[in-house]
């Protein structure tokens, strides 16, 4: 099937690979895609609701920057990629139109060799899918564990290499929790697949956007929201102890716009800046509803 969704039967889960669109279970990639044996690629993901891809330009900024940092010569313009992604949205008929849209590129399909393939002969591959997922409801509270951050030092690139996060999430599940707060030494970095921020004495505190954390779109939106509301913000590395003593601990991601963390390593945390937290949370949701043309 072509990238155009006209004539494509509405699907509960939609997949795409290099120009072919169809039911996700029927889409496959070659065994020699460099994503398979090297994880040689990058990705991005965001939420879809009401036929709108949320914060797409922000996600494109991050995706194209990841391609640049990995030296992947991604061949599609932003306009072309947007058209491809919206073809999935138009073909999607699952979960009342709500879902998570994921796309990734790899350095192409070639025999296994650590060296980059010849760019004149091998083009990057593009894979995408849209599947049902609900946003975390506003009232959901998260329980987490803490773990030493053993990831490499390119966390600002949204690469396909996520084994430390996979292992960490499994450990969280086995501990009866939903997420992990990483730390390097005694300094908090981020979470396995989310950002963490803090309300401390009326200020929104977050980790500086350096190579130790992913520049999360949701946290960036929350920072802008705080500034609009006159809430001070500060980029600062804080210790695990300072995090545990924060007035509020906040989790943000593409699937969790702004939620509370209420327990870390089975110890109750936060809950000391209720009014300010809900002010930020309500504003984050209002922005989402307006952007997706529901308000």
Where are these regions (language model features)?
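Helix-start/capping segments and mature chain N-termini
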Residues: 7-90, 115-295
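Short, glycine/charge-rich beta-strand/loop segments that flank catalytic centers
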Residues: 77-86, 98-112
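Short secondary-structure capping/junction motifs at helix and strand boundaries
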Residues: 90-102, 139
